[in-house]
Amino acid sequence: MKDKIFIFLQYIIPHSLTSRLVSKLAESKNKHLKNYLINLAIKKFKIDISEAKETDINKYTSFNNFFIRELKDGLRPISSDKKIISSPADGVLSEFGDITNGSLVQAKGKTFTLKALIADSSTTDFTKFATIYLSPKDYHRVHMPIDGKLTKMVYIPGKLFSVNKVTAQNVDDLFAKNERLVCYFKTEIGEVAVIFVGALLVAGIETVWHGKVAPNYYKDIQIWNYDNDSFNIEFKKGDTLGWFNFGSTVIILMPNNNISFKYNQSNANISVNQDLALIAE
């Protein structure tokens, strides 16, 4: 019954208005308010502040600034092996595997289409996927899983349903309904996409090359092309791509059938830069 009420509320809550109000609070630079919110989050979500590069909450300019905190150097080591694809984020590896007949697994018994996710029917090369859920306690920066060059970024407007196990099991096409940002990269294995999926209460999605893109900055699909001589935006595996100002989900799409995942089952905890998959010879 509790889950049904939660799902019902997801459909009647004004997603954009709620997220904008939360964003105003999260961006407040009032010292007393932001310190209260930070301390509340640390206590409620059991955030390990000792992992942060800056452990003094007074040094954070806002609640958002705290949520996109950097980690201590060397805390998430990364493999130098070029055949290892690393995790782009801290969180839970909620689903992963093959893209079968153009569909990805959302949760047990539920699938959604690649076409709906990326709002593009012309791309058919993606054959593997991994979905990582970032809870409020997790580190919120997203990193590059493999060496690559940015070729395109696509903003897709949408809803802002909460993203968690309950909504994944009960809201059809959840990740294809929510607002999202699809970043395409040219890599040695072909085209790879890293997708930032928005959610209720997520105060923003930002990238290091563009700045803030969401929530609901645009009413229509927006496309930025970077695959020309005017741009040369390259990333090494482990470089920071961007961040969420609260928590949500990252989906990585990969093109190569010779990729094998390093996990046997879903819902495993995973850390950024941890080995996610292996590129076979």
From Swiss-Prot:
Signal peptide (residue range) = none
Q: Which NCBIfam families match?
A: PS_decarb
Encoding gene (name): psd
Q: List residues modified as Pyruvic acid (Ser).
A: 248
Compartments annotated for it: namely:
Cell membrane
> Per UniProt, which keywords does this protein have?
Cell membrane, Decarboxylase, Lipid biosynthesis, Lipid metabolism, Lyase, Membrane, Phospholipid biosynthesis, Phospholipid metabolism, Pyruvate, Zymogen
> What's a GO biological-process term for it?
phosphatidylethanolamine biosynthetic process
One Gene Ontology MF term: phosphatidylserine decarboxylase activity
Name under which the protein is recorded: Phosphatidylserine decarboxylase proenzyme
Cofactor(s) named in the record: pyruvate
For this chain's record, the cofactor binding note is:
Binds 1 pyruvoyl group covalently per subunit.
Q: Native species of this protein?
A: Francisella philomiragia subsp. philomiragia (strain ATCC 25017 / CCUG 19701 / FSC 153 / O#319-036)
Q: Which residues are named in the active-site annotation?
A: 90 (charge relay system), 143 (charge relay system), 248 (charge relay system), 248 (schiff-base intermediate with substrate)
Known pathway: Phospholipid metabolism; phosphatidylethanolamine biosynthesis; phosphatidylethanolamine from CDP-diacylglycerol: step 2/2
Provide the topology term for how it sits in the membrane.
Peripheral membrane protein
Q: How does it assemble?
A: Heterodimer of a large membrane-associated beta subunit and a small pyruvoyl-containing alpha subunit.
| Positions of the record's site feature: Cleavage (non-hydrolytic) | 247-248
